[in-house]
């Protein structure tokens, strides 16, 4: 046997042994035999590096020092899930599904508390691994993910597929890691989720390999070739992915809740952290029929476990002004440990919330973290209230500018409507420069506050006139940081226009809505001239957003600001694929079978450029099926329904 054949044999044998060990939990050889073969492969590859295969298991342990993480644009939108926190809220969602789908069936899965990632395979080989990021753009973490031993470098089938899952740190490995950090004098991680996220952002891949991350895969992001979520998970197992075995088929709310109760009992016994249960409509065609909101699928929901609570005392209340003028109360409290972090402040939301709970300074309260992130006051312990405590004094004037505060009838918030309120301007500047908006690195709250206080900037357009000399007048800003900020400001001029639109801070327009708006109108100037009717035609965007956008661009201030930004050289064009009226505009199209000329992602991009909505399953709402070679059940179903069929060549001819 020649060396190339020997390397191939060892690689395939070791990958099979790893699959048996990590996925099937049924090892067929002793560790010593695996180690012997592994060392033999290491030696052969070292002597013949040109023969090292892409799926070699040695990629999992070898060390690479990365320069950083490059951005990765996902070819598919990776939506987050909506959350519910009670049986009543879950029942509302289930009833909403039932109104659209007759006799829906569900799959209930554990919600793993880790870091979301996507794996991209071509011809069965792992080519790219990326974080979810904002759902459109994440970070390429391929080298680190290759060090996770249960992630297959080569699938059991030579297919193109994109899968989503969760990387997590098992509790045993988390305890070991924190013990090592304490011995080294480093700060322990607060929880396994933070440890997993920190590990995947390591530049030294040897550290990733050492820490022992693991994964569970749960969704096909590329158009699915199965009919149900249950079939998708079974197919994943056949391909070699690690799939969580704790799942249940359910037909109604009672059966869903039975699984949630079982998951609650299991929670402390599992070798990994979970923070809830995900409920999905099982049938993929029905998922397609239900569709998406701007942020989340309508066919799935995440039930989050009740949050951990802690008792503390309210010492004082601060009132702060946000960029939209909303005045928010925040409680200062006796510091207390909650969900493994020390908490000393909690939001009180608004005046109605304070009055409803009758919150007073000096009260003992129970606090919790909503979604395990934001501290909130849940309950006042009235039996511990000292005598004589007076109710909170509600401000009538803005704490920043002194203007009268307004309480509109249709709102619960107090609002400062002074457009020149310094707090609002400062917060708008901070928002504009933030990561999800224009991403001006180095231009954080401290620097912006100083620029504003020194009257070096008064609106976002002024940022593009800043010089290194201006920045050097600020406290703790040296030459290197000043150059970095000026460079980041210049770079932000080239951003795609949805970043700018989000950065303008128009009410109701978040990142997803901004992207949908620019996909449709292609240019910020064109959007600024759009009517409410035109905007309302965009799927997932309603009249509230349409009214907010049109009202904003009708103001003199917005018109002046656009001129200033354009004169400063800021890009107004959307740099992604534009959904203009095309031959397939508004059509729902399904791809099936093997394509011989185009990659599946290329075919999807071409269809979307023609205005199509690309779906993963065939239903009565499907307008067209593009069928490649060896097309199976989807093609048969389309023919039965009388749906128009195209070949790959038909698509290429366009």
Curated annotation (Swiss-Prot):
Purpose of the protein: DNA ligase that catalyzes the formation of phosphodiester linkages between 5'-phosphoryl and 3'-hydroxyl groups in double-stranded DNA using NAD as a coenzyme and as the energy source for the reaction. It is essential for DNA replication and repair of damaged DNA.
Organism encoding this protein: Lactococcus lactis subsp. lactis (strain IL1403) (Streptococcus lactis)
Keywords, alphabetical: DNA damage, DNA repair, DNA replication, Ligase, Magnesium, Manganese, Metal-binding, NAD, Zinc
Similarity remark: Belongs to the NAD-dependent DNA ligase family. LigA subfamily.
Residues that coordinate or bind NAD(+): 31-35, 80-81, 109, 132, 166, 280, 304
Named cofactor requirement(s): Mg(2+); Mn(2+)
Binding-site positions, Zn(2+): 398, 401, 416, 421
Disulfides per UniProt: none
UniProt name for this protein: DNA ligase
Catalyzed reactions per annotation: NAD(+) + (deoxyribonucleotide)n-3'-hydroxyl + 5'-phospho-(deoxyribonucleotide)m = (deoxyribonucleotide)n+m + AMP + beta-nicotinamide D-nucleotide
Domain of life: Bacteria
GO cellular component annotations of the record: cytosol
Enzyme Commission number(s): 6.5.1.2
Top class in the EC scheme: ligase
SMART domains for the chain: BRCT (SM00292), LIGANc (SM00532)
BRCT domain mapped to chain residues: 579-654
Residues at the catalytic site: 111
Pfam families: BRCT, DNA_ligase_aden, DNA_ligase_OB, DNA_ligase_ZBD, HHH_2, Nlig-Ia
GO process terms (BP): DNA repair; DNA replication
GO molecular function, one term: DNA ligase (NAD+) activity
N-terminal signal peptide: none
């Amino acid at each position: 046997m020649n060396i190339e054949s020997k390397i191939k044999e060892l690689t395939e044998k070791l990958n099979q042994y790893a699959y048996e060990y990590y996925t099937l939990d049924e090892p067929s050889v002793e560790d010593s035999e695996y180690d012997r073969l592994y060392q033999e492969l290491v030696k052969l590859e070292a002597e013949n590096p040109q023969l090292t295969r892409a799926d070699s298991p040695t990629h999992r342990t070898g060390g690479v020092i990365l320069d950083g993480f490059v951005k990765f644009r996902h070819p598919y939108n990776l939506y987050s899930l909506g959350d519910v926190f009670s049986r009543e809220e879950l029942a509302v969602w289930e009833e909403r599904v039932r109104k659209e789908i007759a006799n829906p069936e569900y799959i209930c899965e554990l919600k793993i508390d880790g870091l979301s990632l996507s794996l991209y395979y071509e011809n069965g080989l792992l080519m790219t691994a990326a974080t979810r990021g904002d759902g459109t753009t994440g970070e390429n973490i391929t080298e680190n993910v290759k060090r996770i031993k249960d992630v297959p470098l080569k699938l059991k089938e030579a297919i193109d597929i994109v899968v989503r899952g969760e990387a997590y740190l098992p509790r045993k490995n988390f305890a070991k890691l924190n013990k090592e950090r304490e011995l080294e004098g480093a700060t322990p991680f607060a929880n396994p989720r933070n440890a997993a996220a920190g590990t995947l952002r390591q530049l030294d891949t040897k550290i990733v390999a050492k820490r022992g991350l693991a994964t569970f895969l749960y969704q096909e992001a590329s158009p699915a070739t199965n009919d149900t979520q249950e079939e998708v998970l079974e197919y994943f197992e056949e391909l070699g992915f690690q799939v969580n075995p704790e799942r249940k088929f359910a037909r109604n709310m009672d059966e869903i809740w039975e699984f949630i109760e079982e998951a609650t009992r299991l929670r402390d016994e599992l070798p990994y952290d979970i923070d809830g249960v995900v409920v999905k409509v099982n049938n993929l065609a029905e998922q397609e029929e239900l569709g998406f909101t701007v942020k989340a699928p309508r066919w799935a929901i995440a039930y989050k476990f009740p949050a951990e609570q802690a008792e503390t005392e309210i010492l004082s209340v601060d009132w702060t002004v946000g960029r939209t003028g909303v005045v928010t109360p925040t409680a200062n409290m006796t510091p207390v440990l909650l969900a493994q972090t020390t908490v000393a402040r909690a939001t009180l939301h608004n005046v109605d919330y304070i009055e409803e709970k009758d919150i007073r300074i000096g009260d003992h309260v129970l606090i919790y973290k909503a979604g395990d992130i934001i501290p909130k006051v849940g309950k006042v312990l009235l039996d511990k209230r000292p005598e004589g405590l007076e109710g909170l004094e509600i401000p009538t004037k803005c704490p920043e500018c002194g203007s009268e505060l307004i309480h509109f009838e249709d709102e619960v918030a107090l609002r400062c409507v002074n457009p020149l309120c310094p707090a609002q301007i400062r917060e708008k500047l901070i928002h504009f420069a933030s990561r999800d908006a224009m991403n001006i690195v180095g231009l954080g709250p401290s620097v912006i506050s100083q620029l504003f206080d020194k009257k070096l900037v008064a609106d976002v357009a002024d940022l593009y006139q800043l010089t290194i000399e201006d920045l050097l007048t600020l406290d703790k800003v040296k030459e290197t940081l000043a150059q970095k900020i000026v460079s980041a400001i210049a770079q932000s001029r080239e951003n795609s226009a949805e970043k700018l639109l989000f950065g303008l801070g128009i009410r109701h327009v978040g990142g997803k809505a901004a992207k949908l708006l620019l996909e449709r109108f292609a240019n910020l100037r064109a959007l600024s001239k759009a009517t409410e009717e035109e905007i309302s035609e965009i799927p997932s965007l309603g009249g509230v957003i349409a009214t907010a956008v049109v009202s904003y661009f009708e103001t003199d201030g917005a018109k002046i600001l656009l001129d200033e930004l354009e004169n400063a050289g800021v890009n107004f064009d959307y740099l992604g694929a534009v959904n203009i009226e095309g031959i397939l505009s508004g059509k729902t199209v399904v791809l099936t079978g093997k394509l011989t000329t185009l990659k599946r992602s290329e075919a999807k991009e071409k269809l979307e450029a023609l205005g199509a909505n690309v779906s993963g399953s065939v239903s009565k709402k499907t307008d067209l099926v593009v069928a490649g070679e060896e097309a199976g059940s989807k093609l048969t179903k389309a023919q039965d329904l009388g749906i128009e069929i195209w070949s790959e060549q038909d698509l290429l001819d366009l």
